[in-house]
Amino acid sequence: MKGRAHIWVALLLACLPPRFRNLDKDVSSPVCRTDDVYTGDAFYPFKKKKYVLYDVHIGEGFNLQKEVLYRVALAVYYLNQEERTHVHYLVLPPWCYVTHWGRERTNARIKWSIFFNLKALQNVIPVMEYAEYEGQFGPHTDYILSYRHIIGEWPKRGDKKSFQVLKLDKCQVKGYKLKKNLRKNCDHKYSVEYSGKCTNVKGKKMECLEFFFITSHFVSSTLLDIFQYDADSVLIKHGSNILVAFMNELVDANLEDVLPYSEDLINEGDQFVEKNFKSSKNYISCHLRYTDFRKISTYDVSPVGISLLKLLYIMFLRKSTLIFVSTDEKKEVKKVIDSQFPQFKHFFFFYENEKLHTGQVAIVDQWICARSGTFVGNIFSRFSMHIKWERSLIGKGGPDHNLDLCGYSISTNHELRKKYSDVQDAHLDEEALQKLRPLYMRLSQKDRDFLRTICYDFAHYYPQNVSIYRRGERREEGRLM
């Protein structure tokens, strides 16, 4: 009996985190996996695990899918705070098909760790990639759940239920199937397409919940109810239906700053800056979005030529000789540079790497933009927004170093002007203008007005604290004009 007791004590000590073991060295344990430890809970190894899977609407962009992670992660955080007898895992959906990856449809099921450093997120909530989950449980879950916002007036009824439970097809879940003519002992009767048609996930039960405000807190409360019964895993279909969290919610949960880029991709961007800019901080970066934005009249995208001329003006204004361009139309932009600005061609730089995945190239682009002295983006673009988010986290979030190119009709379109926090119709700087004089003289009045107008995004959309996970330095910021 004593021998068994000693074995139990040995196992207990092996599983406890280092601060409980009082050991000088963190000896790897044969019992507890070091990559499977929830650092926020000392007694994690002894708790039963529950799993929250999710996905988004098929084809959603890379940066929107990144945003949805924060919403679901916040729900899982609330779960672990509310219910401490179990530990709840966030299962990250694989990347299979993303709209902006074009024809690069793949069944490779790319992991999040290819793009991001997950250690920061794992400090807040337990996280695992879907590949690991599938390895343990197969493509199965106990519950398939989706949410739908109530549109219109809440129906009058005698009872006071907080939400309505509907059939899953009422949530417009595509690829949903109910298997018929099954054997009696078949548990997983329901099947849905999962994560950009990566695979099909089968579930035992399914529900669609309808409510006014699908917040992360509401989601956590419904998950808590489900997990209290005989359920160990839930798949949330269309996690993008969850409302965006308030910044203070993310800050309070330590989730404001949990998706740093992969170290490999950061190093790739750093090497590009070192090679081309000699590590100069005074380069201009920009994001020019054209492909689909041209079709949306309210975005009022300016022509490539006048956009590039405005970037040159800002470059000369900032006493720089370097412009890094991130764009979804590199060939078109390069063509315009060659034809309209051959004398300034040596000022423009692009990042290209055929060995990397499209998503990886996009992140390297974002990091190079994040490091720049001044960034010029598009307030309607999530790609630009995530660059500004990253810049805020490395101490470059000041408004005068994060500009918007402005809509093309900004000087006359009053509704468009309301979409910016500030619009300045400034006088042109003569010294900077002198270097562009021949080109400026050929401009129409509309183009001249566009050139001198400076637009600003809303700073309160972005983090106000410098990250402990990201590398960067604060810098003194002055007015642009």
Swiss-Prot record:
GO MF, one example: peptide-O-fucosyltransferase activity
Specify where it is mainly localized.
endoplasmic reticulum
Question: Signal peptide position in this chain?
Answer: 1-22
Q: Which residues form the active site?
A: E60 (proton acceptor)
Q: According to the lineage, what is the superkingdom?
A: Eukaryota
Q: Where is this site: Essential for catalytic activity?
A: E390
Tell me the keywords, alphabetical order. Carbohydrate metabolism, Endoplasmic reticulum, Fucose metabolism, Signal, Transferase
- Enzyme class comes to transferase
Q: In which pathway does it act?
A: Protein modification; protein glycosylation
Q: Does the keyword Transferase apply?
A: yes
Q: What is its EC number?
A: 2.4.1.221
Q: Could you state one GO cellular component term attached to this entry?
A: endoplasmic reticulum
* Residues where GDP-beta-L-fucose binds: G59, E60, G61, F62, N63, H287, L288, R289, D365, R382, F383
Q: Catalytic activity annotated for this protein?
A: L-seryl-[protein] + GDP-beta-L-fucose = 3-O-(alpha-L-fucosyl)-L-seryl-[protein] + GDP + H(+); L-threonyl-[protein] + GDP-beta-L-fucose = 3-O-(alpha-L-fucosyl)-L-threonyl-[protein] + GDP + H(+)
Name the Gene3D superfamilies on file: 3.40.50.11340, 3.40.50.11350
Q: Which InterPro entries does the record match to this protein?
A: GDP-Fuc_O-FucTrfase (IPR019378), OFUT2-like (IPR045130)
**Location of the protein in the cell:** Endoplasmic reticulum
* Any Gene Ontology biological process: fucose metabolic process
**Which function does this protein serve?**
Catalyzes the reaction that attaches fucose through an O-glycosidic linkage to a conserved serine or threonine residue in the consensus sequence C1-X-X-S/T-C2 of thrombospondin type I repeats (TSRs) where C1 and C2 are the first and second cysteines of the repeat, respectively. O-fucosylates sporozoite proteins CSP and TRAP. O-fucosylation regulates stability and intracellular trafficking of TRAP but not of CSP.
Describe the family membership recorded for this protein in Swiss-Prot or TrEMBL.
Belongs to the glycosyltransferase 68 family.
The protein here is known as: GDP-fucose protein O-fucosyltransferase 2
Q: Which organism is it from?
A: Plasmodium vivax (strain Salvador I)
